[in-house]
């Protein structure tokens, strides 16, 4: 039908050319119009099947894509919550590497149990191999459990169903986002130990504020007297000296009050110094503003007592700045020690993760074997020829339209010229 209409259109166009040569412009316009209508009919008859065929091809491609996506989804053995959890934190994810590929997973809400899925045929072959890329790494599992417990992140071992003939476990996965923990990036223990000014957990300055601080063991007063703040104040020099002389005269107890200065104490032997080692550490913490992570409240207050006793034996305090510096670095024993009067030397540093090796999320598009281009069959060749006919017909229509417009102008000019001749 298309070929008949095409032949008929060419005949009309040829007749129009003949009439144009003979001078019958009106007849030529009529034949050109018939040829144009024939070409328009050809375009309509050939374009509709092409559009329908293209739409069917697109629908078929979409159906194939949907089927491939459904096949790439986890099977019934894999919980659905696992695939959901891997998409909750895409910015903390990196591309899948064979090292952390596993066939076990952590169930959400239960961080101590792992589910062992059925091993695939590929894993069965590699079970006896020493270089098993799909084995479970205990350190990685421990880090995942720690993160999921402490930080509440969406961490899980990611599993993709693997067929026997697949070269990788996720070749048909269209949306991959796996959380990979790099070594010691989230090692909480190492980060606290590496802090230079980290304080000890035994430091009472960082204990609960609700806990009552008990009086020190070297006080020679009762607990009730200590709590009522009725003991002798140490700010008065005479009372302080009187309090020292009222104590026992044992050499071991008195020797610590007889050391003239810190520099002289360094030259004495340990038998004469008594607690010289602890006093050296106290001085270093006082004047170097170092951390008191290895000291306790008792050692700090005893060191302050030693400093005051040394200055008192020498006869007078050196200056007020020295007294203020001691009072700022050591708690005042004239008051009940509380967490407000004990100044924390350093605060616990906020945990900051070192520069991570995480990469941006890697979303793999559908990958597989490259489709081979099929050989052109009879229907394909017919379709291509039909499309070519449509294109040629559209070009021919444009040419005929321009030719008709030109002839109409010539016809108008001819009619006007004949009218002028008749008038004359």
UniProtKB/Swiss-Prot annotation:
Superkingdom of the source species: Eukaryota
GO cellular component labels: cytosol; mitochondrion; phagophore assembly site; phagophore assembly site membrane; phosphatidylinositol 3-kinase complex, class III, type I
Region (Required for interaction with atg8): 73-212
Coiled-coil segments: 50-78, 390-420
Chief location of this protein within or outside the cell: membrane
UniProt keyword list: Autophagy, Coiled coil, Cytoplasm, Meiosis, Membrane
Region entry Disordered, spans: 268-299
Gene3D superfamilies registered for this protein in UniProt: Phosphotransferase system, lactose/cellobiose-type IIA subunit
GO biological process, one term: macroautophagy
Motif AIM mapped to chain: 178-181
Gene ablation phenotype (knockout): Defective in nitrogen starvation-induced autophagy. Cells are not temperature sensitive and have normal sized vacuoles.
Biased composition (Basic and acidic residues): 268-284
Keyword hit for Coiled coil: yes
Role this protein plays: Functions as a part of the autophagy-specific VPS34 PI3-kinase complex I that plays a role in autophagosome assembly. This complex is essential to recruit the atg8-phosphatidylinositol conjugate and the atg12-atg5 conjugate to the pre-autophagosomal structure. By binding to atg8 at the phagophore assembly site, atg38 helps establish a positive feedback loop for recruitment of phagophore assembly proteins, including atg8.
Subunit annotation: Component of the autophagy-specific vps34 PI3-kinase complex I composed of vps15, atg6, pik3/vps34, atg14 and atg38. Interacts (via AIM motif) with atg8; the interaction is direct and leads to recruitment of the autophagy-specific vps34 PI3-kinase complex I to the phagophore assembly site.
Family statement: Belongs to the ATG38 family.
Name of the protein in question: PtdIns3K complex I subunit atg38
Organism: Schizosaccharomyces pombe (strain 972 / ATCC 24843) (Fission yeast)
Gene: atg38
